[in-house]
């Protein structure tokens, strides 16, 4: 009778271990993406503050591939604001994904603890 219980617990532990490793990798990836998006957001903000100090009639060029396109100050300003907004939205999504992954691992650990407590009670 003890052998099936041991096999069941062993299987549950191996599944938990695989899930924890997979989740840790996904959380690390999300952290890296969040850091990169924060850098992008900061870069866009700093560029925008520099641009806003210039006179409205200043010629500005946007780099596209290997060429530069003449743009108005307002067009570049709106592009930078949009870039910041998109980065903030993606950061929020990644943080939600990260918290979901951490919750799912905790729930799996709690389920195994409950299974162990039930086995000890028998």
From Swiss-Prot:
Disulfide bonds: none annotated. Keywords: Acetylation, Chaperone. GO terms for cellular component: cytoplasm; prefoldin complex. This is Prefoldin subunit 1. Heterohexamer of two PFD-alpha type and four PFD-beta type subunits. GO terms for biological process: chaperone-mediated protein folding; negative regulation of amyloid fibril formation; protein folding. Belongs to the prefoldin subunit beta family. The keyword Acetylation applies. Binds specifically to cytosolic chaperonin (c-CPN) and transfers target proteins to it. Binds to nascent polypeptide chain and promotes folding in an environment in which there are many competing pathways for nonnative proteins. GO terms for molecular function: amyloid-beta binding; protein folding chaperone; unfolded protein binding. The modification N-acetylalanine is found at residue 2. It comes from Homo sapiens (Human). Pfam families: Prefoldin_2 (PF01920).
